[in-house]
């Protein structure tokens, strides 16, 4: 085992200067000679730290508006030089060993995220010298430490104190892995951005923002290994997107309970994304990635009670999501009534945590304040490929709707229609949702024919003694035939909301008129497979 390597000389060159002054001071206080470039060097010098400009060290000035700063043999020889192997050649050419490199890269992602960013700006924010130093140091991690993240500064200083100014090979190897991950993600961003610019680059009139890159490079960070995947014979892990901008299962904090399973995470995501769509206090209960009970109300407790009563049988062992902080009364109702796998809410108050503490197997997550879903990409793996599409963040408002029947919906029917339309978006296709007074009373999910989803929704309502008469019905896609409308009329549905767009729309509308049903077209489909 190699003994810890002393850090005697460090090169610091960072775009993100978070924590760099304190870190540089810590290094200097421990006898480390500091080399630096440009703005980083000025910051250290103004703080009174002894620092040598790289241009003074190499005898070669920065040039070309800073494009060439560190690409010099005295820099890269000092980083790449193998101790005890290249010592003679380093002495011959007056190359001093550099034991630590502290670098983070030009803010390419932040630059191209601006709507007004030009290609020229993007080009100027492609770092060249930085990644070269990072990769050089990571390659020579046997002798050199590479630090690319300010979050690692305190741990590096602590280990140097533990080992008299030195770092272990294990730590240098771990830092090298982080460095390669950092440069891989950086190059991926650049490739994805310019790949999406191809149409504009070749004079195509199509807007480049509407294109997907020619090659797709993804950067996800492993959050946890799992006991197994969807089934016990499958290995699994959970990876998260470091750029996730909104509250999600990936960013949530687990407050108690066993480790989340693969299925827990998938179901919790479905529940949370559904509950986000409501502005009133809402509860969504999910089983096998399908909502089985959804309701809104004036209080969280009332919303939970109403959602649970939709389908108590399916709610057993389910996932419960709220869009308000969880309170003690609601927590008491849950644990007294049902077995639950996961509860997720923006926050969980202390009294509620006290109630749930008696059920330590219940996984409790706090996800933070909810925002409206942000645009992004959805992926579906197929054998030999990856389907990529824009995330379905579409939702309709009153002004988007068309009433196509003779009978107009009442205000209450319109509210119920919009409510169950939101729910239908999160139900596996073919999806049918019955709702009354902003509460689901029957959900038919995942059937191969739409009419059978409608029949199942009615059966579920009847099994729980819920009256469908006067309810609204949502369908995630258009009705191809009138049989779905006939099935809805048979159980007393009074209002139907659906996308429209079938070649048989006239027949469907005629069926609704025949039954005295109000029908609303959304002109937006929400298939979910």
UniProtKB/Swiss-Prot annotation:
One Gene Ontology cellular component: cytosol
Signal sequence, renumbered to the chain: none
Entry-linked SUPFAM superfamilies: Cytidine deaminase-like (SSF53927), Methylglyoxal synthase-like (SSF52335)
BP-aspect Gene Ontology terms: 'de novo' IMP biosynthetic process
GO MF assignments: IMP cyclohydrolase activity; phosphoribosylaminoimidazolecarboxamide formyltransferase activity
Start and end residues of each MGS-like domain: 1-148
Pathway where it operates: Purine metabolism; IMP biosynthesis via de novo pathway; 5-formamido-1-(5-phospho-D-ribosyl)imidazole-4-carboxamide from 5-amino-1-(5-phospho-D-ribosyl)imidazole-4-carboxamide (10-formyl THF route): step 1/1; Purine metabolism; IMP biosynthesis via de novo pathway; IMP from 5-formamido-1-(5-phospho-D-ribosyl)imidazole-4-carboxamide: step 1/1
Entry keyword set: Hydrolase, Multifunctional enzyme, Purine biosynthesis, Transferase
Catalytic activity: (6R)-10-formyltetrahydrofolate + 5-amino-1-(5-phospho-beta-D-ribosyl)imidazole-4-carboxamide = 5-formamido-1-(5-phospho-D-ribosyl)imidazole-4-carboxamide + (6S)-5,6,7,8-tetrahydrofolate; IMP + H2O = 5-formamido-1-(5-phospho-D-ribosyl)imidazole-4-carboxamide
Protein name listed in UniProt: Bifunctional purine biosynthesis protein PurH
Organism: Sodalis glossinidius (strain morsitans)
Upper taxonomic lineage: Bacteria, Pseudomonadati, Pseudomonadota, Gammaproteobacteria, Enterobacterales
């Amino acid at each position: 085992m190699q003994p810890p390597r002393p850090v005697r000389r460090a090169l610091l060159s960072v775009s993100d200067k978070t924590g760099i002054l304190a870190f540089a001071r810590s290094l200097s206080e421990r006898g480390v000679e500091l080399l630096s470039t440009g703005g980083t060097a000025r910051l250290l010098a103004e703080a009174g730290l002894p620092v040598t400009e790289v241009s003074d060290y190499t005898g070669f000035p920065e040039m070309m508006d800073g494009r060439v700063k560190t690409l010099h043999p005295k820099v890269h020889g000092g980083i790449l030089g193998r101790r005890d192997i290249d010592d003679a050649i380093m002495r011959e050419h007056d190359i001093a060993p550099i034991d630590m490199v502290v670098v983070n890269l030009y803010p390419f992602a932040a630059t191209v995220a601006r709507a007004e960013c030009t290609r020229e700006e993007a080009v100027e924010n492609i770092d060249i010298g930085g990644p070269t130093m990072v990769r050089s140091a990571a390659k020579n991690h046997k002798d050199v430490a590479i630090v690319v993240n300010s979050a690692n500064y305190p741990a590096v200083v602590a280990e140097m104190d533990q080992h008299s100014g030195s770092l272990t090979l294990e730590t240098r190897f771990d830092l090298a892995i982080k460095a390669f991950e950092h440069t891989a993600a950086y190059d991926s961003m650049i490739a994805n951005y310019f790949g999406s610019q191809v149409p504009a680059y070749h004079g195509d009139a199509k807007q480049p923002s509407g294109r997907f890159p020619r090659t797709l490079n993804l950067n996800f960070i492993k959050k946890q290994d799992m006991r197994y995947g969807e089934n016990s014979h499958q290995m699994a892990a959970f990876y998260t997107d470091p750029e996730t901008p909104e509250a999600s299962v990936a960013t949530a904090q687990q407050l108690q309970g066993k480790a989340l399973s693969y299925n827990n995470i998938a179901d919790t995501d479905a529940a949370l994304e559904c509950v986000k769509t409501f502005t009133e206090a809402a509860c969504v209960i999910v089983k096998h990635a399908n909502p089985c009970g959804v309701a809104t109300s004036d209080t969280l407790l009332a919303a939970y009670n109403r959602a649970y009563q939709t389908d108590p049988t399916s709610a057993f062992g389910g996932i419960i999501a709220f869009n308000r902080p969880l309170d003690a009364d609601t927590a008491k109702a849950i644990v007294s009534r049902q077995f639950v796998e996961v509860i997720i809410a923006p926050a969980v108050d202390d009294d509620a945590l006290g109630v749930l503490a008696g059920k330590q197997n219940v996984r409790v997550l706090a996800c933070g304040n909810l925002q409206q879903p942000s645009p992004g990409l959805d992926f579906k793996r197929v054998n030999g490929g990856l389907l990529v599409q824009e995330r379905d963040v579409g939702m309709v408002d009153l002004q988007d709707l068309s009433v196509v029947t003779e009978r107009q919906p009442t205000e209450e029917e319109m509210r119920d229609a919009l409510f169950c339309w939101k729910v239908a978006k999160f139900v596996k296709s073919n999806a049918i949702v019955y709702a009354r007074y902003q509460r689901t009373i029957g959900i038919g999910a995942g059937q191969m024919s739409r009419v059978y989803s409608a029949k199942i929704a009615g059966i579920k309502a009847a099994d729980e003694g819920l009256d469908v008469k006067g309810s609204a019905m949502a369908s995630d896609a258009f009705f191809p035939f009138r049989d779905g409308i006939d099935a809805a009329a048979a159980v007393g549905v009074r209002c139907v909301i659906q996308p429209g767009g079938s070649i048989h729309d006239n027949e469907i509308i005629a069926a609704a008129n025949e039954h005295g049903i109000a029908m609303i077209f959304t002109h937006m489909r929400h298939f979910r497979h």
